């Protein structure tokens, strides 16, 4: 919580870990977006990113849901992404992140649009942030079962985010997911044949 940051040497001494080993860990945490590094002369100072915190699940899902929506409506992108990463590092279930945090946020931002509290431009920005949050979940390494395959299609542009969330939930459950996005412009008399042609390529 230090506002001035700590050097790698200070951190390694406090944790009683070899300095070189500690540096490797610090670089990994920085790559994950949990820490930021500032060079001052020959010294590297390390700071925790905003939003970095240890959570306890399942009791903290409601707390995270509230924070996520608060940060989302304040357009605090980096803090939101750190929040999702923190959930992973706090051993949250990926499926629960989607059902307890992401999906409620999707429905809530559409409610804000319906109530006239935000416009289309702001909705697009908030949806992009939610979509990026979903991609963080998709980046988590999961061993997929070659026998479990699913194609996810969005019926219109309004349900694209929901289809992305559904795709991510299948992914976290070990499915090989083919997410086609909004297919409404492609639905015509030849759509069934087109889809069958695609399916023969992947299955």
Model-derived regions, located:
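Short phosphate-binding/catalytic loops that engage adenosine nucleotides
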Residues: 15, 34, 174-176
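Residue-level marker of alpha-helix boundaries and capping positions
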Residues: 16-17, 157
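Short helix-capping/hinge SLiMs at alpha-helix to coil transitions
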Residues: 1-4
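Long amphipathic alpha-helical segments
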Residues: 17-138
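A short acidic, leucine-rich amphipathic alpha-helix
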Residues: 10-12
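C-terminal regulatory/effector modules of DNA-binding transcriptional regulators
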Residues: 116-119, 132-203
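Acidic, two-metal ion nucleic-acid-processing modules in DNA metabolism proteins
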Residues: 7
């Amino acid at each position: 919580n230090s506002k001035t940051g700590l050097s790698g040497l200070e951190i390694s001494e406090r944790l009683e870990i070899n300095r070189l080993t500690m540096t490797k860990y610090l670089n990994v945490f920085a790559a994950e977006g949990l820490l930021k590094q500032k060079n001052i002369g020959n010294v590297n100072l390390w700071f925790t990113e905003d939003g970095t915190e240890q959570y306890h699940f399942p009791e903290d899902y409601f707390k995270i849901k509230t924070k996520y929506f608060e940060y989302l409506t304040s357009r605090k992108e980096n803090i939101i992404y750190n929040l999702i990463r923190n959930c992973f590092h706090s051993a949250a279930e990926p499926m629960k992140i989607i059902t307890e945090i992401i999906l409620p946020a999707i429905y809530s931002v559409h409610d804000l649009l319906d109530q006239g509290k935000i416009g289309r431009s702001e909705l697009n920005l908030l949806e992009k942030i939610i979509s990026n949050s979903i991609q963080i979940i998709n980046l988590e390494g999961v061993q997929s079962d070659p026998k479990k395959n699913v194609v996810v299609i969005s019926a219109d542009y309004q349900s694209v985010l929901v289809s992305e969330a559904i795709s991510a939930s299948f992914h976290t459950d070990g499915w090989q997911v083919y997410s086609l996005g909004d297919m409404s412009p492609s639905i015509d008399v030849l759509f069934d044949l087109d889809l069958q042609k695609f399916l023969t390529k992947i299955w």
